[in-house]
Each structure stands twice: as structure tokens, then as C-alpha cells.
Amino acid sequence: MECVNFEKNKQKIALLTDSCADLSAQQREGKPIFVLPLCIRCGQEEYADGETIFARDVYRHLEEGELPKTSLPDGGRLKDILDDIAAQGYEKVLAIHLSAGLSGTYNMVRIQGESRDDLEVAVFDSVSGSLGMGAVVLQAWEDIQGGMSWEELTQKRVPQLIANTFPYFSVDTLEYLLKGGRIGKVTALTGTMLNIKPIVGFAPDGQLASVAKVRGRKAVQGKLVDQLRAKLGSHTRYNLAVANGGAPEEMEQLAQKVKEAFPNYEHFWTGELDATLSVYIGSGMLGACIQFLDE
């Protein structure tokens, strides 16, 4: 077991999230971020998201006509992670999880967290996913390092971050959202032949919802920038993030456009879509997110 240095974390707070936060090993390095993998079943085999199955594997299954099945994380694995957190000397756990409108992960962690006598566990529904959720986790670590108290983190800051983080992403096809039962409030478009691409965000109840649509893939990046600009208003302090699902070169183009449009960001993060969300979104996703830090 590694020796934990609590110099920058005197309250001994660990961060727990799940594989749908899309945080890379590099983004987690040196931080007390623990990741609970969701489960994915392909045929008779079950895999752990981000460990034994990745988005590229899901795309292959989808191309072959097989729709993988997603499921909750393993309860025993969650217990093991919490045991490990306690064994390393942490006393508190700030848990931020995939939207309860898409998954039961939040409730699962909440119930198990309540049963712990050795850890104080505060569990939050991110009402988001991908780097929308990841941005909340990463900014929470910045606040922990800055000395923010546990009470302020749990009672004010994290709820504020969740309410002020806005991810948007393009969906190349609605086929998998429909098949996987996660279509939510996304408008089912019949104009496939018209090359209509929906831009999707999260509704207040955590389900996916249509926010815009464009004609043709080339218009996606500009529309994502427009969505962020429409949200910006009078805010002056913000973080930015972009993500992709099987479209890394286009994400780099999008990153440049987002940075040019909003040059005064405090942090800029990038990510690759996880295997779980890839089951419903398929390949070709582009996403952009803005997170406001002022009230």
C-alpha cells in the first residue's frame, strides 16, 4: 500500500467517481481520485469499463450489429474501493456519480456509503456525465487543495458546481439511444436522410435532452461553441472541457475553437468517452462543456 501524503489534503478527503467521468490516468495522477467501473456485458462475457473494455471495443461490437448491455458497478468492488480508501488513511469521501436519470450508480453508492462507520461519505448526483461530471470532480480537488472545508464543499460548493456545469455533445445517430432505452427527452428525428445531427445536453431531471440540431457534421463544432457562448452571460470565471468518442482529430479542432472563443478559462480539460456511454451514443461524438466558478 502506498504511503499517502496529506500535506495538501489535511482533511483527508478522497474523491470517488465512476468510469463515466472520463478521467484519464494522467488527469488522476497524484490526486486522491478513485474510480468505480460500471459493468458491460457482451454476449456471455462481463467487463469492467475502463479496465477490461474500452470505447473502441464497444464501437467494434456496434459495427458488428451487437448492442452491449450496461449494468451497475459490482457491489463487492465498491466495498473493496471504500475499504482501500479507509486503509490508506482517508476519513471522508466526496462521491460524484453519473446522472441518476441514466443510471442507478448514485443510489447504489449512497446506500453503501451510509453503512460505513469508518468513513464519512457524501454522495452527489452529478446530473451529468462524461467530462461534465469529470469537471466537477477535478474542480472539487482544486478546492480541497485550496483548503475549503468539508462543510462548505458538501453543503455549498459541490451542489453549486453541479448546477453550474453545462456539457453539450453531438450524436451522430440516435439508433443506439433508442435501442438502449436512454433516449430520454431527445427528440427522435426522422430526417436521417437529411443528415440532421442533434446537439444534446442534460435536463434538470438528469435525462438526456435535445438542445439544438444542425445539418451536417461540419456544423457541429460551431454549434457547440454557440451553446457555450449562450450560457456564458456575465460569468467571468470558468473552466472548459472538450471530449470525443472516436473523433480525436475533430476534438483537437474543437478545442482550438473553444479556447479562441473563451480565452480567459482557468482550466481546460480533454477526455475520451467511456465504454458505457459509448454503448448509447456510438462513434463520432464531440462534446464541449463550460463550468462557472463565480456565483
Please give the residue ranges for each predicted region.
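Glycine-rich phosphate- or other oxyanion-binding loops that anchor nucleotides, phosphorylated ligands
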Residues: 65-108, 155, 162
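Broad hydrophobic/π-residue packing in well-ordered secondary structure
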Residues: 42, 47, 57-59, 78, ...
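Mixed-charge interfacial surface used for oligomerization/domain docking
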Residues: 3-9, 14, 20-34, 38-39, ...
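Short beta->alpha junction loops
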Residues: 73, 125-127
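A short glycine/small-residue-enriched secondary-structure motif
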Residues: 53-59, 88, 110-115
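N-terminal glycine-rich anion-binding loop in soluble enzyme alpha/beta folds
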Residues: 13-73, 77
